[in-house]
Design a protein with these regions (language model features):
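Loop/turn-rich, solvent-exposed surfaces of beta-rich toroidal or solenoidal domains
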Residues: 172-174, 183-186, 206-243
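Surface-exposed loop and turn segments in beta-propeller and other repeat-based domains
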Residues: 35-41, 77-90, 134-154, 200-214, ...
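Structural signature of eukaryotic scaffold interfaces centered on beta-propeller domains
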Residues: 1-3, 47-51, 93-101, 157-164, ...
């Protein structure tokens, strides 16, 4: 989301899943900024990020399309020597990218492709000189997570990452390699990490969910504020399926109250003054911008 309350949405067209659209959502309506075909959608999933004023789209780890001003004349910026950092088979996965610095965290899959990122890389972006390069490729070191699976080499999954005040945060939804919608998660945690994936601090983590007697789990999504959106996987949990917010600044949990008639919407992102919600039912059905009281 931008500082002025506009939201940017990267989506694929319903009739052609290999055609992507970049949309601007504002109180004036929805405006298409760009559209392009992607021949290898699964391997080259584009990623969208913003610094609150400008927009960047990372394509296949090799180049960036950078929009400034009125977004009508984007610049193409080649990412320097990506093969020196990124493994050959690493594939970008789109999870909300949030950064307030020149270090942009990006999630990846490698070897096993199930749309569940377990690796990340940091992209160093010099906005003034229009230069970009990958600086590290790693995964979350699970040995400091209380309920990690010692019998498996699987790395923790990464729901979302955020670079905030020169520190790196990640939300992991556990290590399970089976369907979490069918069996639930094994654990989840919010951690502060070093760039090599070592855990600095466990801000919070769940109990071991596999022995809880019922399916459970929570997904986490960082926003353009200090808040993390927490979304329960199941509606019969202690939160009754309702989203909550966790503040990185105050370390407090709070409830979300959406406007009347929008109970089926989910919160996707927010600034200090407004938020973006969506209704998803076998595809994106609705988007809404709401003011925050």
């Amino acid at each position: 989301m931008l500082y002025d309350g506009r939201a940017l949405v990267l989506t694929s067209e319903k009739e052609a899943c290999n055609r992507y659209c970049l949309l601007e959502v504002s109180p004036l309506g929805v405006k298409e900024i760009a559209a392009w075909d992607c021949d290898h959608v699964w391997k080259e999933e584009p990623l969208l990020f913003t610094d609150g004023q400008n927009i960047g789209i990372i394509k296949a780890g090799r180049e960036m399309v950078y929009y400034t001003g009125d977004f009508s004349h984007p610049e193409i910026i080649a990412i320097k020597d990506p093969q020196s950092i990124l493994p050959k088979n690493a594939q970008e996965r789109y999870f909300q990218i949030v950064s307030d610095s020149d270090q942009i965290p990006v999630c990846f899959e490698d070897q096993v492709y199930t749309n569940q990122a377990r690796n990340f890389a940091l992209l160093e972006f010099d906005r003034e000189n229009k230069q970009a390069k990958w600086t590290t490729y790693s995964h979350i070191d699970k040995k400091d997570l209380s309920h990690h699976d010692m019998s498996s080499d699987a790395c923790p999954k990464i729901d979302s990452m955020k670079s905030w005040k020169q520190e790196l945060y990640a939300f992991t939804s556990g290590e399970s390699q089976t369907s979490i919608n069918k069996w639930g998660m094994d654990y989840y945690a919010l951690v502060k990490i070093f760039s090599d994936g070592r855990v600095i601090e466990k801000i919070f983590e769940s109990d071991c969910l596999k022995g809880a007697g019922k399916k459970a789990g929570v997904n986490g999504l960082f926003t353009d504020t200090d808040y993390l959106i927490l979304t329960p996987l199941f509606k019969n949990d202690d939160w009754k399926g309702k989203q909550k917010l966790f503040s990185l600044a105050t370390r407090e949990l709070c409830d979300i109250a959406l406007p009347r008639g929008m109970s089926k919407h989910k919160l996707q992102n927010m600034t200090d003054n407004c938020c973006l919600t969506y209704l998803y039912d076998r595809g994106l059905k609705e988007l809404a911008l709401c003011q925050i009281d």
